[in-house]
């Protein structure tokens, strides 16, 4: 009888402990624990960060980083299995889908800046980029001033189109800005001569040019609409427990040899599906950000020492 009572007491303690653990969880971690699912938002054409391969599977530098976060979440929650579901997002839908719980991580090419931090949070920086324009060499466009009075494409809902709009107004350039739904559409407008230039993050412009039918016919401006700005994995605002797991996972990754290997894989080697090699070495500023991980939106935080 005493043995049965002891067994009952042990079971009661275990059940209470399990319930207490569940009750202590909040926000995204609790959602994931209850459902056994983590939802990742991906882009379909943000090479090499987040895009679809020939089998329509999301791949890329940011996707690999997010999968490291998934591993950390699984370990944190002591789950035997954690299902990953991928959801497509665009520049216009990524923040709303994060806010309403459709996705838990946005793994793409999203700039961490003060305006976005009013709505969302970011984990540690994984890339630095500046807003520039791409054009055909035959157009002979060398500076931002050369875009005066011309049709220029940029993607809706991006920092790029905002910076283009502000520059257009402040310099009285009279540019006809053509909004595109996705980055690939912005570049396509230049390819098909519907626009003389496309304004995007310089690394995305490089990837589109490299994947075009005639890469040598395009040129990316040295003139920039911005200082180098940080990319980060986007997550919900005011969710410190989930952000802590993501920050720790990315910090460990970036400071390790695996972080360097991951960068080499996507920027210095041939990547699927077309075997492109972007050949973009890691700059001094990004090396510093990897050695000392930070989620700062301030470009000055990334100046090489």
Residue ranges of each PLM-predicted region?
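Immediate post-signal peptide segment of exported/extracytoplasmic ligand-binding proteins
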Residues: 22-55, 140-150, 286-305
């Amino acid at each position: 009888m005493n043995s049965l009572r002891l067994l009952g007491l042990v079971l009661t303690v275990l059940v209470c402990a399990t319930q207490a653990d569940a009750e202590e969880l909040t926000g995204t971690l609790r959602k994931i624990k209850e459902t056994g699912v983590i939802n990742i938002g991906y882009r379909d054409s943000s090479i090499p960060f987040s895009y679809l391969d020939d089998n329509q599977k999301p791949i890329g530098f940011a996707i690999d980083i997010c999968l490291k976060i998934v591993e950390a979440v699984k370990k944190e929650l002591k789950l035997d299995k954690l299902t990953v579901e991928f959801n497509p997002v665009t520049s216009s839908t990524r923040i709303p889908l994060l806010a309403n719980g459709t996705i838990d991580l946005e793994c793409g090419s999203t700039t961490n800046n003060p305006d976005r931090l009013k709505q969302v949070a970011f984990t540690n920086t994984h890339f630095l980029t500046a807003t520039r324009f791409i054009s055909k060499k035959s157009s002979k466009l060398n500076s931002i001033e050369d875009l005066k009075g011309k049709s220029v494409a940029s993607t809706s809902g991006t920092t790029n189109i905002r910076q283009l709009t502000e520059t257009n107004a402040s310099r009285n350039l009279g540019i006809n800005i053509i909004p595109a739904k996705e980055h690939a559409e912005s570049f396509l407008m230049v390819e098909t001569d519907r626009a003389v230039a496309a304004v995007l993050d310089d690394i995305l412009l490089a990837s589109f040019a490299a994947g075009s039918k005639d890469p040598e016919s395009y040129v990316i401006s040295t003139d920039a609409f911005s200082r180098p700005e940080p990319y980060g994995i986007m997550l919900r605002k005011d969710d410190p427990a989930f952000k802590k797991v993501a920050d720790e996972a990315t910090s460990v990754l970036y400071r390790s040899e695996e972080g360097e290997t991951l960068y080499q894989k996507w920027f210095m080697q041939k990547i699927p599906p077309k075997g492109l090699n972007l050949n973009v070495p890691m700059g001094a500023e990004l090396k510093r950000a990897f050695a000392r991980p930070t989620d700062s939106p301030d470009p000055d935080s990334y100046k090489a020492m």
